[in-house]
Amino acid sequence: MPNRVISPDANDTTRERILKAAILRFSAHSYDNTGLRDIAADVGVDMAYVQRSFGSKEKLFYEAVKESGKPEQLFADDDGCLPSILTKQILSRKAANEIRVLDIVIQSFASPAASRVLNEFLEEDFVTPLVSKHPMVPRRRAALVAAFLAGVGILKDVIKADPLLKGDAAALEEDVRMVIAAILELGPNDLDTSCD
């Protein structure tokens, strides 16, 4: 999923400032250890304003995950390039101060409330758009692609697994692309070679 660098902007609305503060909080603290009061204090607004703007902590968490992942960009210009798009995204180097969706997800794995929100995000913002673009792909396989990407991302960015960080980057990229294509059951004729 596209990467997100969080930085203040003088043109940000209060709602946008709240969302940026939430992304920062949720990427550094678990869902259960992050309160609306903390986020409100980070922005300098009343907690009631945060609630009016987003409705609940769960809805704010969902918006933070969605904004950090920008899933709509993944499926906007697919045209047979989805395995390449997903591969480039998961293998791209993380820039300083960059927050990725996995940074938020990893902080809140153990929270049942966060898991419900993450499941909703997976369904609505990854599985459904993928299946809409590729109607022959079962929902189960779309979810398996997400699982594979999460695993690669965790091993690469969190565990720092040497086989994913050292060696032939082009070979790794091709391996990941082919695994995604295999999960989706896309044959060589289904892939646009101009995506490479």
Please tell me what each predicted stretch does:
Residues M1-V45, E58-K59:
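Basic, helix-initiating cap at the start of DNA-binding domains
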Residues E58, K94-A95, A110-A114, F126, ...:
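Short alpha-helix boundary/capping elements
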Residues S115-E120, L130-D196:
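Hydrophobic/aromatic-rich alpha-helical bundle segments in the mid-to-C-terminal region
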Residues K70-D103:
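Hydrophobic alpha-helical connector segments
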Residues V65, R93-E124:
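Amphipathic alpha-helical segments used for helix-helix packing
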Residues A48:
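Key DNA-contact positions within bacterial/archaeal DNA-binding proteins
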Residues R15-K20, D32-N33, R52-A76:
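An amphipathic alpha-helix adjacent to DNA-recognition modules
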Residues A21, R25-A28, I104, S108, ...:
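Solvent-exposed, amphipathic alpha-helical segments
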